[in-house]
Amino acid sequence: SLSNKSAGNSVSYTKEEYETVIFDKVLLEKTSMLDTPFWNRIVQILGGVVERTTSVVAYGMGSFETKNAIVQMGCLLNLVDYLRRRNESCSVAVEIFDPVMSELDVGLVEKLGFACVKENENCKRIAKESTLFFLPHGDIFMYGNLLETNIESDTLENIILVGNGLTNYIENASRLGSGLAFQNHQEETQLSLKSICKVREILVENVVHRHRIAPPKQQIRPGATGAKVEGDKQQQGISLDGNLERAFNDTSICTFARRKQQ
């Protein structure tokens, strides 16, 4: 059984009770999200890049006893439904992994029709086909491992990345002296992400925080140097409700194009 500590009084669930209670909460988040500007913005961005996407890999959502994970799973269900509608002739395979997931979490994932990755890949999945990677609030090493693996396998263009703002991660890490850098094994040097590929990054939302200046009207965050940045500059910042804000603050969608060798 699992103790649900977030409910005030400690509640223990059996496997069946856990799957039923959390399953219902996930479906509620899934349904309520469909009417939000946040979800409409995701659909607007993904519309031109997922025509052939039939694989989804989600890392780092955590245990579904947390509210963030429940909201994020609701979003993932909507993403999968959207991909299946866009690719009616193909099935969409979904795999999920987080090392903190319990047996009850694994049971819930399977009840939802998804598969759990059996071993910790450390986010080193090669995108052999067009794959949507869902990394809400992922750590920078997760992005680094995923990108470096696909740089080495020359499969960067198969990645659609939904997660934390990548440009902010790169800039913040660089200030700390730990920026994303990738090994050039032939020349034994390190290369920055921007020197290897073009990054197209679109911010899903600008959260309006209390006691802070409202975000600018421009909805597209400047990408990495040399990046191709597109979008509707007249789009207003989207103010999320509390649950969405905590689960998806600073979310962006990135695609990548390998730079041609000189």
Enumerate the language-model features and the residues they cover:
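Short beta-strand element of Class I
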Residues: 92-95
